[in-house]
Amino acid sequence: MARVTVQDAVEKIGNRFDLVLVAARRARQIQSGGKDALVPEENDKVTVIALREIEEGLITNQILDVRERQEQQEQEAAEIQAVTAIAEGRR
């Protein structure tokens, strides 16, 4: 079992409350969103992986926001393509 000291992660994020929010958000992405870990998993739980990513500076709240916006734009573009294909098929 990995031991994680969160002091470095707190320094990267700014305060412990925001750290909890960012780590939880990232852990949910890894667990349910099908996102790959950016650090070796080493049989760690997703919360530990999220904290290690934050500690190494790979994940911040801003990075998560940008990634989510990009994914949303890609999904919207795919939906528009699908609707266009359906509409053209009906002509």
From Swiss-Prot:
Keyword Oxidoreductase found: no
EC number: 2.7.7.6
Reaction catalysed by this enzyme: RNA(n) + a ribonucleoside 5'-triphosphate = RNA(n+1) + diphosphate
Keywords in alphabetical order: DNA-directed RNA polymerase, Nucleotidyltransferase, Transcription, Transferase
Enzyme class label: transferase
GO biological process, one term: DNA-templated transcription
GO CC aspect terms: DNA-directed RNA polymerase complex
Subunit details: The RNAP catalytic core consists of 2 alpha, 1 beta, 1 beta' and 1 omega subunit. When a sigma factor is associated with the core the holoenzyme is formed, which can initiate transcription.
Protein name as catalogued: DNA-directed RNA polymerase subunit omega
Lineage: Bacteria, Pseudomonadati, Pseudomonadota, Gammaproteobacteria, Enterobacterales
GN (gene name): rpoZ
